[in-house]
Amino acid sequence: MASNRGAGGSLYGGADPYRSREGLSTRNASGSEEIQLRIDPMHSDLDDEILGLHGQVRQLKNIAQEIGSEAKSQRDFLDELQMTLIRAQAGVKNNIRKLNLSIIRSGNNHIMHVVLFALLLFFILYMWSKMFKR
Protein backbone atom coordinates (compact mmCIF):
# COMPACT_ATOMS: atom_id res chain seq x y z
CA MET A 1 0.00 0.00 0.00
CA ALA A 2 2.81 2.42 0.76
CA SER A 3 4.14 1.98 -2.77
CA ASN A 4 0.93 3.42 -4.28
CA ARG A 5 1.31 6.69 -2.40
CA GLY A 6 4.63 7.64 -3.97
CA ALA A 7 3.46 8.34 -7.51
CA GLY A 8 0.23 10.28 -7.23
CA GLY A 9 -0.11 10.58 -3.47
CA SER A 10 -3.20 8.40 -3.64
CA LEU A 11 -4.27 4.97 -2.52
CA TYR A 12 -6.23 4.57 -5.75
CA GLY A 13 -3.40 4.70 -8.26
CA GLY A 14 -3.62 7.86 -10.33
CA ALA A 15 -7.06 8.94 -9.06
CA ASP A 16 -7.78 11.94 -6.89
CA PRO A 17 -6.68 11.43 -3.28
CA TYR A 18 -10.23 11.78 -1.87
CA ARG A 19 -12.08 9.89 -4.56
CA SER A 20 -14.33 7.11 -3.31
CA ARG A 21 -16.77 4.61 -4.71
CA GLU A 22 -19.74 6.74 -3.65
CA GLY A 23 -19.01 9.45 -6.21
CA LEU A 24 -16.97 11.97 -4.23
CA SER A 25 -14.40 13.88 -6.20
CA THR A 26 -12.14 16.79 -5.36
CA ARG A 27 -10.88 19.83 -7.11
CA ASN A 28 -8.53 22.55 -6.00
CA ALA A 29 -10.15 25.86 -5.19
CA SER A 30 -8.34 28.73 -6.92
CA GLY A 31 -4.81 27.61 -6.12
CA SER A 32 -5.24 27.47 -2.37
CA GLU A 33 -4.98 24.55 -0.02
CA GLU A 34 -8.77 24.29 0.25
CA ILE A 35 -10.52 21.29 -1.22
CA GLN A 36 -14.03 21.33 -2.61
CA LEU A 37 -16.04 18.12 -2.58
CA ARG A 38 -18.72 17.42 -5.13
CA ILE A 39 -21.22 14.61 -4.75
CA ASP A 40 -22.58 13.04 -7.91
CA PRO A 41 -26.38 13.41 -8.21
CA MET A 42 -26.83 9.69 -8.79
CA HIS A 43 -25.78 9.09 -5.18
CA SER A 44 -28.40 11.35 -3.60
CA ASP A 45 -29.83 8.41 -1.66
CA LEU A 46 -26.88 8.90 0.68
CA ASP A 47 -28.82 11.74 2.31
CA ASP A 48 -31.64 9.32 3.08
CA GLU A 49 -29.14 6.86 4.52
CA ILE A 50 -27.58 9.61 6.62
CA LEU A 51 -31.00 10.61 7.94
CA GLY A 52 -31.72 6.97 8.72
CA LEU A 53 -28.41 6.70 10.55
CA HIS A 54 -29.21 9.88 12.50
CA GLY A 55 -32.50 8.29 13.54
CA GLN A 56 -30.74 5.11 14.62
CA VAL A 57 -28.17 7.11 16.57
CA ARG A 58 -31.00 8.99 18.29
CA GLN A 59 -32.68 5.68 19.17
CA LEU A 60 -29.43 4.27 20.53
CA LYS A 61 -28.91 7.43 22.57
CA ASN A 62 -32.42 7.12 24.03
CA ILE A 63 -31.84 3.45 24.80
CA ALA A 64 -28.53 4.26 26.50
CA GLN A 65 -30.25 6.93 28.60
CA GLU A 66 -32.99 4.47 29.56
CA ILE A 67 -30.40 1.87 30.50
CA GLY A 68 -28.61 4.45 32.63
CA SER A 69 -31.80 5.46 34.43
CA GLU A 70 -32.74 1.80 34.96
CA ALA A 71 -29.28 1.07 36.37
CA LYS A 72 -29.64 4.03 38.73
CA SER A 73 -33.06 2.90 39.94
CA GLN A 74 -31.75 -0.66 40.42
CA ARG A 75 -28.79 0.69 42.40
CA ASP A 76 -31.13 2.78 44.57
CA PHE A 77 -33.36 -0.24 45.14
CA LEU A 78 -30.37 -2.40 46.12
CA ASP A 79 -29.12 0.30 48.51
CA GLU A 80 -32.55 0.47 50.14
CA LEU A 81 -32.72 -3.33 50.34
CA GLN A 82 -29.27 -3.44 51.91
CA MET A 83 -30.29 -0.89 54.55
CA THR A 84 -33.43 -2.93 55.30
CA LEU A 85 -31.32 -6.06 55.64
CA ILE A 86 -28.90 -4.31 58.01
CA ARG A 87 -31.81 -3.13 60.17
CA ALA A 88 -33.30 -6.65 60.19
CA GLN A 89 -29.95 -8.19 61.17
CA ALA A 90 -29.62 -5.69 64.01
CA GLY A 91 -33.14 -6.55 65.21
CA VAL A 92 -32.47 -10.30 65.10
CA LYS A 93 -29.16 -9.84 66.90
CA ASN A 94 -30.89 -7.76 69.59
CA ASN A 95 -33.65 -10.37 70.03
CA ILE A 96 -31.12 -13.22 70.30
CA ARG A 97 -29.22 -11.26 72.92
CA LYS A 98 -32.44 -10.70 74.89
CA LEU A 99 -33.36 -14.39 74.58
CA ASN A 100 -29.94 -15.47 75.83
CA LEU A 101 -30.22 -13.10 78.80
CA SER A 102 -33.69 -14.46 79.55
CA ILE A 103 -32.45 -18.07 79.45
CA ILE A 104 -29.52 -17.23 81.73
CA ARG A 105 -31.76 -15.38 84.21
CA SER A 106 -34.44 -18.04 84.38
CA GLY A 107 -31.94 -20.81 85.06
CA ASN A 108 -34.24 -23.42 83.52
CA ASN A 109 -32.82 -25.83 81.04
CA HIS A 110 -35.77 -25.95 78.67
CA ILE A 111 -33.52 -26.15 75.64
CA MET A 112 -31.58 -29.03 77.19
CA HIS A 113 -34.87 -30.87 77.81
CA VAL A 114 -35.95 -30.38 74.20
CA VAL A 115 -32.60 -31.66 72.86
CA LEU A 116 -32.69 -34.73 75.14
CA PHE A 117 -36.28 -35.47 74.09
CA ALA A 118 -35.31 -35.27 70.40
CA LEU A 119 -32.34 -37.62 70.95
CA LEU A 120 -34.52 -40.10 72.86
CA LEU A 121 -37.16 -39.98 70.12
CA PHE A 122 -34.58 -40.65 67.38
CA PHE A 123 -33.10 -43.52 69.43
CA ILE A 124 -36.54 -45.10 69.87
CA LEU A 125 -37.30 -44.77 66.15
CA TYR A 126 -33.91 -46.28 65.29
CA MET A 127 -34.45 -49.27 67.58
CA TRP A 128 -38.00 -49.73 66.30
CA SER A 129 -36.77 -49.77 62.67
CA LYS A 130 -34.09 -52.36 63.57
CA MET A 131 -36.57 -54.62 65.36
CA PHE A 132 -39.16 -54.68 62.57
CA LYS A 133 -36.66 -54.84 59.71
CA ARG A 134 -36.40 -58.42 58.41
From Swiss-Prot:
UniProt-listed InterPro entries: T_SNARE_dom
Presence of keyword Transmembrane helix: yes
Domain t-SNARE coiled-coil homology: 40-102
Topological domains annotated Vesicular: 132-134
Main location: Golgi
One annotated Gene Ontology cellular component of this protein: Golgi cis cisterna
Residues of the signal peptide: none
Cytoplasmic side: 1-110
Region described as Disordered: 1-31
Keyword match Transport: yes
Positions with biased composition (Gly residues): 1-12
Domain of life of the source: Eukaryota
SUPFAM superfamilies listed in its UniProt record: SNARE fusion complex
Location in or out of the cell: Golgi apparatus membrane; Endoplasmic reticulum membrane
GO annotation (BP), single: positive regulation of response to salt stress
Role played: Required for vesicular transport from the ER to the Golgi complex. Functions as a SNARE associated with ER-derived vesicles.
The family this protein is said to belong to: Belongs to the BET1 family.
PANTHER family associated with the record: GOLGI SNARE BET1-RELATED
Protein name: Bet1-like protein At1g29060
